[in-house]
């Protein structure tokens, strides 16, 4: 086999060292890190901040007061209302040039701080799961033997494990997209409230998406915990076939 492809010995030693490091890290992740992390997330789910039953407690002040209605008279110093109003608006437009923006009378409109605090705790957990799954996936892939006829039952278990790890990675990445969509959707609604402060439905919609995001964040944490449980259980149950997919494994591994 060595005669078919010439490999630099120094490079080969570095690759072998990399394989050994990945193997050591992955086995430690499955044996120790996964069970510790699932217990940690299970404890996190029991914290008071994630067990609010009255969702009105997570509502935030919009900080956008409803302005007083404008009273228009039929005449003003000999000018009728519409003409005078138009003249005043024309004068203002001439005095102030540039891009028009909505004015926030009470300063910057902040995000829902309670949800932001939860999100800032959840995002590192999502990233951590993606990174650890990637390491374990690489380990299992490196254990897959070369393709040949014979008993490939163990190989199919390896491939199913890799597929499950890849699915977990994709689902975890989708959680990050979900968080981004929440911020974008809320920002658009707040802009609508600034433009149409008298429309109550916009204000109610903001509280609705805040409540929905709170429920979604709790579900995300629950899913992260469950994924650690599932991966730990699946790999431990099939560890023999994952590490030795064939009886003649010593001769068929790369």
Swiss-Prot record:
- Keywords, alphabetical: Acetylation, Apoptosis, Cell cycle, Cytoplasm, Nucleus, Phosphoprotein, Proteasome
Picking any one GO biological process from the record gives:
regulation of G1/S transition of mitotic cell cycle
Subcellular localization is given as:
Nucleus; Cytoplasm
Q: Which residues carry this modification: N6-acetyllysine?
A: 195
Q: Which residues carry this modification: Phosphoserine?
A: 17, 24, 247
Q: Name one GO molecular function term.
A: p53 binding
Cellular component terms per the entry's GO annotation: cytoplasm; nucleoplasm; proteasome activator complex
- Is Acetylation one of the keywords UniProt gives this record? yes
Pfam families reported in the protein's UniProt record: PA28_C, PA28_N
* Subunit architecture: Homoheptamer; the stability of the heptamer is essential for the specific activation of the trypsine-like subunit and inhibition of the chymotrypsin-like and postglutamyl-preferring (PGPH) subunits of the proteasome. Interacts with p53/TP53, MDM2 and MAP3K3. Associates with the proteasome. Interacts with CCAR2. Interacts with PSME3IP1 (via C-terminus); the interaction is direct and promotes the association of PSME3 with the 20S proteasome. Interacts with COIL; the interaction is inhibited by PSME3IP1.
Please state which protein family the record places this protein in: Belongs to the PA28 family.
According to its record, what is known about the domains?
The C-terminal sequences affect heptamer stability and proteasome affinity.
Q: What is this protein called?
A: Proteasome activator complex subunit 3
Q: Which gene encodes it?
A: PSME3
